[in-house]
Amino acid sequence: MVYKTKNPDQVSWTQKIPQPSLDFIHSFNLPKTAKIIDIGSGDNMLVDYLLEEGFENITVLDISIKALDKVKKRLGEKAQKVNWVVSDITEFQPDSTFDVWHDRATFHFLVTSEQISVYLDRASKYVSDYLIIGTFSEKGPERCSGLPIRKYDEDQMSLSFSDGFKKISCITLDHETPFKTKQNFIYCSFRRI
């Protein structure tokens, strides 16, 4: 719904350069053939940077076809190099696993124990190597785009993903929205065990 009526500079999660995500991905020293999925990508710029860096096996998932259409239009012919999936993450059942599962700002929209359980099950089944989760920290907002969210600290993140994953590192940082407000995020990376 949001992507039908708003441009990137009108939504709080817009991030021109997804630096924390790129830093985590670079730290894994991945081959360019690594299978990377961006969960709840919306119209963010991560796929642009991954393509520019030569990654060849990228999947972009979002519940909004409008958001994905905006990204496809922005990428032009490069969009043909990406696997596009329109799905709610709690209904997503891929055919194979991913070397990297990246999620910036989707996990915190899952507020019921059932939604969270399904998400954790999907991650457990379909992540072969690395997991990156960026979500609102305990200092983050109470709502986002009018929707309720769930906030996390490092211990809660580690516990949430403790079944099958070992935490590599976590960072907290302020994301500056297009309207110059600050939102505090926690990013954690995990390795499959």
Labelled PLM ranges:
Residues 1-96, 110-193:
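Class I (Rossmann-like) S-adenosyl-L-methionine-dependent methyltransferase catalytic domain
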Residues 102:
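A conserved beta-strand element that flanks and buttresses the S-adenosyl-L-methionine
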Residues 105-109:
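Short catalytic micro-motifs in class I SAM-dependent methyltransferases
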